[in-house]
Amino acid sequence: MAMKKLLIASLLFSSATVYGAEGFVVKDIHFEGLQRVAVGAALLSMPVRTGDTVNDEDISNTIRALFATGNFEDVRVLRDGNTLLVQVKERPTIASITFSGNKSVKDDMLKQNLEASGVRVGESLDRTTLSDIEKGLEDFYYSVGKYSASVKAVVTPLPRNRVDLKLVFQEGVSAKIQQINIVGNHAFSTEELISHFQLRDEVPWWNVVGDRKYQKQKLAGDLETLRSYYLDRGYARFNIDSTQVSLTPDKKGIYITVNITEGDQYKLSGVQVSGNLAGHSAEIEKLTKIEPGELYNGTKVTKMEDDIKKLLGRYGYAYPRVQSQPEINDADKTVKLRVNVDAGNRFYVRKIRFEGNDTSKDSVLRREMRQMEGAWLGSDLVDQGKERLNRLGFFETVDTDTQRVPGSPDQVDVVYKVKERNTGSFNFGIGYGTESGVSFQAGVQQDNWLGTGYSVGINGTKNDYQTYSELSVTNPYFTVDGVSLGGRIFYNDFEADDADLSDYTNKSYGTDVTLGFPINEYNTLRAGLGYVHNKLSNMQPQIAMDRYLESMGDPDASDFAADDFTFNYGWTYNKLDRGYFPTDGSRVNLTGKVTIPGSDNEYYKVSLDTATYVPIDNDHKWVVLGRTRWGYGDGLGGKEMPFYENFYAGGSSTVRGFQSNTIGPKAVYKNGAHTSWDDNDDYEDCTQESGCKSDDAVGGNAMAVASLEFITPTPFISEKYANSVRTSFFWDMGTVWDTNWDPSSAPSDVPDYSDPGNIRMSAGIALQWMSPLGPLVFSYAQPFKKYDGDKAEQFQFNIGKTW
């Protein structure tokens, strides 16, 4: 047997041993230990080839090259005559990766981090990388206050040089802040300063923002808040000298000490602006005006810089630089602010592009643009385009990106990146109440028909008391100037008695056409004509109905028909930040109609809806919503408004917790009426001379509804779905009344239905979800102020309608 000479041993387990420094010519190369790695691949990674003359340095380079491939745990190179014998031990292949005990970090996030480090199924296992991963994960837990956390990588060998990799987590508990001390504060108390922190050593039950669990990132944010607090009050020399975070021996408690130097208060002595102002010095000077003796304020300085950038952005200077340098005079405690402005190049827009609009046509988005291609860039015009796209309601998110054109010093492309949502909805509603039982409704609505922007709806209701169908179409851009054209046709067969309303049947059909005229960015006027035919039958006489029939000259009619032509009008002010689930802004909608000559009836009717969203945090996750709805109508020329045109309240869109349309005046049937006027739902004759009181709603010619809603982040919902789900707590109130009601015409036990003070109230919780079927709305409300005859419906569920 030929004697083998050891040239260099493993870099991991023994030192390099050199024999034959003179070198030799390699006639052959053999490998031992290769399993997964092919011989050819191993040879290609080596700097030595057959026929080369090699020495100790070449052998060292060979070993390093083989280790560098990441495929081997051990490499030895031996000489057998003129043959190189390469002995290797391959790293095992990862067959599977699992996790155990991780609650704070999701599996998907862990897999992404492992893949970024080269640890994935099918790859070789590098044990040194595992150590780094263990340490990195433990450091993450330490940063969020879990100092007792540990992460261990468990490697289980499998046949054919494979392993199972399992990361075992012991997260422990978050260390809670025992005390926060601020040392060096004299102008403000420690309690006052800490009240602005997210981290707290004491958190009252009502504080949903404060947190006793220590997090390094939150502490950094709180320190910045502390700095801003002082700088905004004139303390220009304020400094955070040091911060100590101490851990209790059991690693469950944290003590934080912040050492500060307040310094003195300084006043602004003036602002000096210099640099390239691009000819807008007068406008910039207005933005930098200060009141004499005003305290230095860091936030105002930052806002001033942003305002200057926005001003220049409106004129096409897309990338201006604005830097403020305070010159502090310690002698007289003043600060002179020197503002250097560099407007940079002026840009014009080469192209406007859209990304993410797989359904919506480019033309639908482009017509909402206020920034034009080939024109100077205007940041305000770009933002207006974003607002208008958001208000369409077609998209979950809209983002803008201004991109430089390569090779051009004065051109940019504006890119609108949208994420489309499902604009079609299958409208299905179900409600359940202690008295009402189960009720249903259905319909289909598509607000972006085939991506054209057309709104098309087919709605229908079929139940025990109603057969209703409607087809509606709206073209929002009937003309290139944005004049809209909408129309609808409908048919309705309504058995009011079965709906717990006053006893009559109405078969109606009609149509209307409406034009919308945009006045400016936020205001639209509407005008149109309508026709409706109403055929009433089976009318059991009740006081409100009799008043109407008497005004029409047919007081004893049990059947009645009317054909009416109406002039329809409206006005909409819309400054909401987006079309669905708004978080900021207001919307006002006024609608009305009045009969025109040729109509059997003579009346007018008007309603006003308002909604205002006020965010109370910068991220718009906590929002206060106020809604109102007002309605009023009356007859003209001595006639009354038809009773079937009355306003109603109650239900998911007005006062939740009450059955739909049941709030307000109830029918008082006249002597001889044959109806189910009592609570037993048994038909019988009314025999009381003064009339019979009932629980059948008749509505009124006046209505007022208001709602106060507090929108909160939805618990247990990931950030991915945060824009699709909304949770809120609400307080609803509303009333319906009849301004023409005469209390003397009814029995003494009947309430005064002309009194608007009979307000109903409820409170509850609502959940809205933009599901694949369309908007899903769940609400549970408890009426806490109601009157005799009101019908509760605590749980309500609806698909296809949000507010």
Swiss-Prot record:
Keywords assigned by UniProt? Cell outer membrane, Membrane, Repeat, Signal, Transmembrane, Transmembrane beta strand
In terms of InterPro entries, this protein maps to: Bac_surfAg_D15, BamA/TamA_POTRA, D15-like, OM_assembly_BamA, POTRA
Q: Where in or outside the cell is it found?
A: Cell outer membrane
Please cite one Gene Ontology biological process associated with this protein: Gram-negative-bacterium-type cell outer membrane assembly
Q: Quick one: signal sequence residues?
A: 1-20
Q: Does the keyword Repeat apply?
A: yes
Instruction: State which residue ranges cross the membrane.
Output: none
Q: Name one GO cellular component term.
A: Bam protein complex
Q: Which PROSITE patterns does the record match to this protein?
A: POTRA
Pfam families given for it? Omp85, POTRA
Q: Can the keyword Nucleotide-binding be found in this entry's annotation?
A: no
Quaternary structure and partners: Part of the Bam complex, which is composed of the outer membrane protein BamA, and four lipoproteins BamB, BamC, BamD and BamE.
Q: Check the record and name the PANTHER family matching this protein.
A: OUTER MEMBRANE PROTEIN ASSEMBLY FACTOR BAMA (PTHR12815:SF23), SORTING AND ASSEMBLY MACHINERY SAMM50 PROTEIN FAMILY MEMBER (PTHR12815)
- Family named by the database record: Belongs to the BamA family.
Q: Which HAMAP family match?
A: OM_assembly_BamA (MF_01430)
Q: What does this protein do?
A: Part of the outer membrane protein assembly complex, which is involved in assembly and insertion of beta-barrel proteins into the outer membrane. Constitutes, with BamD, the core component of the assembly machinery.
**This protein's name:** Outer membrane protein assembly factor BamA
